[in-house]
Structures are given as C-alpha cells and as structure tokens.
C-alpha cells in the first residue's frame, strides 16, 4: 500500500547544498539478470521509488486545473520542453519505404545530444554548474532510442530520474511537487506523444495487448491518484467515451485513455485488455495501489528495462545507507 511506504522528500539534500559533491557521468551498472539484486538494494532504487510515491501523494484528489505554485525552475523546465517541441516542427519526417521508425528522428535526437548540456545549464543555477553533465544524461535518455527509433517506460523512467536529480540538488523543491507532475511531466508527455506520432516510433519492449500501454506508465499512477475520492467518476467510467471527452483536460489518466483511443482501432477490450480489466476495480485508491505494484513488477523489476538505467553520484548503485 502506497501510504504505508516511507516516502523520503524529493529534495532531501536541500539542507546541505551539494557544492562539494563529486558529480560523475552516469553509466550502466546492471549488465546481467543477477545484477538486478544490486538495483533493488540500491540507493538509486530507494530514492527513485520514494520520489514517485511522494508525487503520487502530492497530486491525490487534485484536478490539473488546481491552483498551485509555479516556480522559476518549473518555468525554465517548460521552456526546455518547448524547445524540444519546436525542434520536432523544424525536423519533418522524411520519405522512406518503412512505415515505422522515421529516420528524421535521428536528426532530431542528434540536436538534443549536442545541445542537452546547454539546455540543462539554463535550468540549473551557476553555483551548481558542475552537476550539469551528470543531470543532462538523464534528459538525453528520456526521449527514446535513436538506433532503434523506439520509446518505452525505461525512457519515461529516465525523465522521472532527471526530475529526481533536480530535486536532489535543490533546483526543484518540496513546494514544486504538484507543478512537477501537472506542469513539467504533463508537458513532457505532450512532447513525447508528438515524437511518437511524428516519427512513428516503435514501442520499446511492448507487451502488446497484455501491457498497460505501449509507451507510458507513470501518468496512469499519478492520474489514478488524482481521481481518488472523486464525487462521481469511478474506474468503470474511463471506458465510457463521453466521460473521457468531458473530463480528460482535468485528469492525466483520462488524457492517456483519449490518446490510446486516437491511436488504436477496434474494441477497447481487445487493444487494451489490461486497462479494460482495471476498469472493473471498485475504487481509484485500489487502482492506484495496484498500478504501483504493477509498475514495480513490470517495469522496475524487469531486466530488459533496467539494463539501460544509468547510475551516478545523485542516483548511486551503492546499497541504501540507513539514517
């Protein structure tokens, strides 16, 4: 149960600015299936899941239109995402025989690869400039794979890790929690959906109809938390087209459902069987708890996803330190 888990604040290092910290370029540490034990015992895993759960608690019962603080750091992150969006417009798909995986994506990605540190430097204050190369790696990892032209939950996790790192160095703070999900992550989703559509990206490691979604997972977790104790919307309503059309602008979960129905044809129960099953769960709190368990089992504990995760000084591979 999410409420019962310890939830370290996302900016637990705020009291001690990491000026003297030795930042490093993150690298892969999970090379074989037996290495997964190292990941599950790591400080990185504890901090990552703690971050996800803290945000889950922060958005509980709140609409996207809820009033919350938007800090300068959040505004700068939105400007960064606007830049990525603009680059898509400047890099149209090329004519090619294959329907999927448009090669223009590689041109778009090469620009990000080149500019990532500059983009992150514009978000991070000058006294934390040493952190930029480390943090920028997670941004580059969060937009898909340029070799395979695919995108999946591992890339989404890299963006959450990027935000977690910004919290750990104090760029984002406790009172940014709601804006992190409703503003920054929501804008990230818009840009990723545009990438997926424009370049016909393949789903990375998709489980087909048996997976939750081809591309995302976190907006279903945070989106179900938003709907906890809703006066009239119940899980059974998200398969109702009218309910989705009338409420998707307020709830991430319903926005995800709308995107799926736009992208897929045929009966919902056939193309999205897992979600169809979830619509039978009686309450949003049960949906939320079940999705957190499923995220751990299907994403965070799966070697094909975690083998690509990178570890540095902010999200370290060493075992959890008590205290």
Swiss-Prot record:
User: What EC identifiers does the entry list?
Assistant: 5.2.1.8
Q: Does the keyword Magnesium apply?
A: yes
Tissue distribution is: Widely expressed.
Which positions in this protein are listed as binding Mg(2+)? 208, 214
Under the heading Pfam families, the entry gives:
PTPA
Q: Where in the cell is it found?
A: Cytoplasm; Nucleus
Q: Name one GO biological process term.
A: mitotic spindle organization
Q: What is its main location?
A: cytoplasm
Query: Where N-acetylalanine occurs along the chain?
Result: 2
Q: Where does ATP bind?
A: 148, 153-154, 304, 307-308
As its record notes, the protein acts as a catalyst of:
[protein]-peptidylproline (omega=180) = [protein]-peptidylproline (omega=0)
Q: What cellular-component terms does GO give this entry?
A: ATPase complex; cytoplasm; nucleus; protein phosphatase type 2A complex
Supply one GO molecular-function term. Answer: protein tyrosine phosphatase activator activity
Subunit (UniProt): Associates with the serine/threonine-protein phosphatase 2A PP2A(D) heterodimeric core enzyme, composed of a 36 kDa catalytic subunit (subunit C) and a 65 kDa constant regulatory subunit (PR65 or subunit A). Interacts with the catalytic subunit PPP2CA (via C-terminus). Interacts with PPP2CB.
Task: Tell me the function of this protein.
Answer: PPIases accelerate the folding of proteins. It catalyzes the cis-trans isomerization of proline imidic peptide bonds in oligopeptides. Acts as a regulatory subunit for serine/threonine-protein phosphatase 2A (PP2A). Modulates PP2A activity or substrate specificity, probably by inducing a conformational change in the catalytic subunit, a proposed direct target of the PPIase. Can reactivate inactive phosphatase PP2A-phosphatase methylesterase complexes (PP2A(i)) in presence of ATP and Mg(2+).
Q: What is this protein called?
A: Serine/threonine-protein phosphatase 2A activator
Gene name for this UniProt entry: PTPA
């Amino acid at each position: 149960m999410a409420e019962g888990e310890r939830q370290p604040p996302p900016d637990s290092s705020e009291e001690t600015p990491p000026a003297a910290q030795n930042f490093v370029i993150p690298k892969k540490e999970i090379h074989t299936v037996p290495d997964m034990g190292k990941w599950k015992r790591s400080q990185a895993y504890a901090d990552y899941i703690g971050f996800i759960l803290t945000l889950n608690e922060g958005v509980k019962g709140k609409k996207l239109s809820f009033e919350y603080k938007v800090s300068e750091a959040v505004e700068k992150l939105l400007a960064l995402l606007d830049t990525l969006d603009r680059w898509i417009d400047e890099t149209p798909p090329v004519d090619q025989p294959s329907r999927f995986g448009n090669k223009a994506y590689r041109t778009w990605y090469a620009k990000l690869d080149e500019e990532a540190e500059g983009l992150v430097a514009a978000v991070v204050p000058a006294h934390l400039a040493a952190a930029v190369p480390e943090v920028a790696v997670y941004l580059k990892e969060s937009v898909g794979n340029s070799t395979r032209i695919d995108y999946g939950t591992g890339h989404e996790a890299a963006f959450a890790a990027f935000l977690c790192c910004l919290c750990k160095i104090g760029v984002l703070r406790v009172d940014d929690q709601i804006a992190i999900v409703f503003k920054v992550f929501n804008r990230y989703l818009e840009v990723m959906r545009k990438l997926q559509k424009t370049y016909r990206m393949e789903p990375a490691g998709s489980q087909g109809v048996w997976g939750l979604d081809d591309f995302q997972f976190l907006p279903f977790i945070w989106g179900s938390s938003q709907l906890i104790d809703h006066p009239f919307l119940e899980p059974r309503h998200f398969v109702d087209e009218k309910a989705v059309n009338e409420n998707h602008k307020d709830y991430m979960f319903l926005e995800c459902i709308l995107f799926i129905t736009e992208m897929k044809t045929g009966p919902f129960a056939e193309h999205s069987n897992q979600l169809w099953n979830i619509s039978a769960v009686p309450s949003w709190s049960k949906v939320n708890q079940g999705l957190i368990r499923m995220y751990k089992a299907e994403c965070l504990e799966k070697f094909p996803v975690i083998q690509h995760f990178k570890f540095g000084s902010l999200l370290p591979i060493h075992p959890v330190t008590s205290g």
